[in-house]
Amino acid sequence: HQEARRQRQMCIRDRSGAIVANGSLRQVKAAFDYGYNMGLAFQIIDDIMDYSSSKTKMGKNQGDDFKLGKTTLPIILAWEKSNKLEREFFLKSLQELKQEKGDFEKCCEILKKYSILNRCKKIANDFVIKAINALNEFSENDYKKALIELANNSLSRDN
C-alpha cells in the first residue's frame, strides 16, 4: 500500500540522516522511532481528513477512501463499536463495494455516533508524543526544535 511505503520512506530518511551525521546507535534508533511514529500519525490524520475535510483543503475528494473500500483506522474503530446492522452496512459498502447514494454520509453518521474521529485524533496525538519523546536522544538545537514543531503541526494539518 502507498501508506505503508510512505511510512517506510519516513523511517529510512530519518534513520539515514542520523547515520550520515555519525550518530550513535541510540540516536539512529531514535531517528527511526521518530520517523516511524510520525509516519503513523501522518497516515491517521490523512485517514481522518477523508471523512472530515473538503476537496479544496485536502487536495482530493472527500470520501475517496470510502469509495475505494479502504479499511482505514476510522473504519476499524467504527467496526469495533458497530451493531449488527451497521456492520452489515460496512460489509456491503466496503467489502462488496455495493455503494448507494448517501452511503458515505451514513458512514460519517456512524463515525460521529461513536466519536471515532476524536478517538483517531487521540491515537495520532499519542504517536506524535512518541515521536517527540524519541528526540530526547539528541541535544537541544534548531534542528530538534524544527522536528518537534513539525510533529506538533502535523496534528492540525488540513492537507
Regions found by a protein language model. Give the residues of each.
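Acidic/histidine metal-binding catalytic segments
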Residues: 25-28, 84-90, 139-150
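Divalent-cation-assisted or electrostatically stabilized phosphate/pyrophosphate-binding catalytic cores
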Residues: 5-6, 29-33, 55-81, 87-126
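Active-site alpha-helical segments that house and flank conserved acidic catalytic motifs
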Residues: 18, 28-56, 71, 75, ...
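Short helix-capping/linker segments at secondary-structure and domain boundaries
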Residues: 18-25, 80-88, 158-159
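Single conserved hydrophobic/aromatic residue that forms the stacking wall/gate
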Residues: 1-12
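Amphipathic, well-ordered alpha-helical segments in soluble domains
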Residues: 10-13, 44, 100-103, 127-130
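Short hairpin/turn module used for nucleic-acid contact or packing/dimerization
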Residues: 117-159
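Alpha-helical transmembrane segments of multipass membrane proteins
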Residues: 15-20, 134
